[in-house]
Amino acid sequence: MWFLLFAASAVVLPPFLYLVKTSLTVPRPGQGTEIGLDNYARVAEIAGWDLWVVTVAFAIGASLLAVLLGASTACLVARTNVPFRQVVFVGAFLSLATPVIVKGIGWILLLGPNNGLVNNLLREWFGIDGTPIELFSLGGMIFIEGLLFTPIAFLLTLPALSAMDPALEEAAAMAGARWPRALLRVTLPLARPSLLAVLLLSLIRALESFEVPLLIGIPGGVQTVTTALYQTVHSGFIPRYGEASAYAVLLVIAVALPLSWYYRVTREAAKFATVTGKGFRPARIDLGPWKYPCALWVLTIPVSLAAPLLIMLWASFLPFYSGPSPEDFARMTLANYRAVWARDDILAGITNSLLVGTGSACAVAAAGLMMGWTVARRREFMRWAIDVVASLPLVFPGIVLGIAILVQFLDLRFIPIYGTVWILIFAFVVQFMPYGMRFCHSGVLSINRDLEDGAYMSGARYFTVLRRIVLPLASPAVVATWIYVFMHAIRDLSVAILLSGPGNGIVSIVILDLWNNGEVPQLAALSVLVAVGAAVLGIAFMKLTATHRLYG
């Protein structure tokens, strides 16, 4: 299995080594370059502590909001008889599939200061002057990021809450505790490791967030580390790759701290086990008269997906967008949908997305199966080494991975993939390798090893066993991996934005360009089509993971 370890190392390690090298490389006019900490000093001088304070405040606020909404919804769905449970579950999965940039722009159309639907209604109904809801602010960023991560927090918390023995809550009820007290004093404390783990993952996600700070933070003059990194490359006549790499290295360190704490928390989760060998009958707490008020709370997840998509759908039928009004019904047209299929830049973005999504999904599924099989079956050093190498990209935010691969292939000019779809495929293979390995590892664990041993005893070689035994039996995990990678590769912005050029832009880049150019109706039409396609993939992924329990 040495070839597998070598191949994984050759793909994963060089981008990060080049990133560190670039951050320490200081150009001297007329003297070439030398090694030093000048880039870090320059970053500290420009940004100071304010940038990090804003970034941390944004991350903490968004993660707390996401866990509050997601965990409380999961608690109600898993432990009570609240209505619309299936609607919430489906809405959470579809929200995962919908591109962040689509939802982010949708929320701007809803809550924007000038033509936002909600602000316009508040001004009209209550006679408010100015801007009732200031979206382009740190508070607006926290609100939108928290809403965007709520479905993930819900899905991650739900399994732990669903598996709890209801006898503990029944004992609390017999002691006179009403259902709110039982949930707060019994259920949630037992789920503490899961809640803390989800909080840490939410914190990591918010630290890495790029789309929300780009769309909402920059117009409001609020900058985080990710947008500072982006502007270091894209502002000015000469990209400052050294300073951008310094930002990236510091962000990796910031992400690594909560990630290491997350692994520690999950290792200690056995202390809070409530599922034992003793059988129990799942039971739900009767909410009584609070049943339907609680239903409004759990509908936060499907509504947070439907609201931005509905305003996008509305805008897609208008010749120009200036805020919804009754007069819009007379102006509705399908011209924007026809224009989507007539524009060369949009068609090129769709084609590139399909190529990048297919290429990266096939590569990750194949590599993930081999690595997952090796980690599941091998022992000692090889298992540990492949697991560590394949998991390294988890530490690197998307924007960091983008700058790392950018500086790598700017230096390796003899590999001419910069500015092509191949550099995007390479980037997404690196980014999603940990997820592919873990999905396929779960699938391989369900296969009895005797089947493989029998094939080896019959004279079959490694690749024969992989092709004839492991692949057919682990095919649900492989297909789920393929769908997951394809679905995320075509929607990603943070990795692609630094690696895309005139010839290799994908759909997310096209949507951002349309937004920057003020072409809202055509942007909305494209976003609706992308959301429909993402929904189909999301439903397929949900069916596979639910049927074969690949996410649990």
Annotate the PLM regions:
Residues 47, 238-240, 344, 518-519:
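Short helix-adjacent coil turns
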Residues 80, 164-165, 170-191, 378, ...:
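Short helix-to-coil transition segments within interhelical loops
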Residues 168, 270-282, 451, 460, ...:
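Short cytosolic juxtamembrane segments of multi-pass membrane proteins
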Residues 181, 218-226, 257-292, 323-324, ...:
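Feature of multi-pass inner-membrane transport and sensor proteins
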Residues 28-37, 325-330, 334:
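Short, membrane-interfacial amphipathic segments enriched in basic
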Residues 1-28, 43-162, 190-211, 215-217, ...:
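Membrane-water interface segments at the C-terminal ends of transmembrane alpha-helices
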Residues 33, 52, 176-177:
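Polytopic alpha-helical membrane proteins, predominantly small-molecule transporters/carriers
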Residues 112, 211-238, 324-330, 493-520:
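Glycine-rich helix-loop "coupling/hinge" segments at transmembrane-helix boundaries
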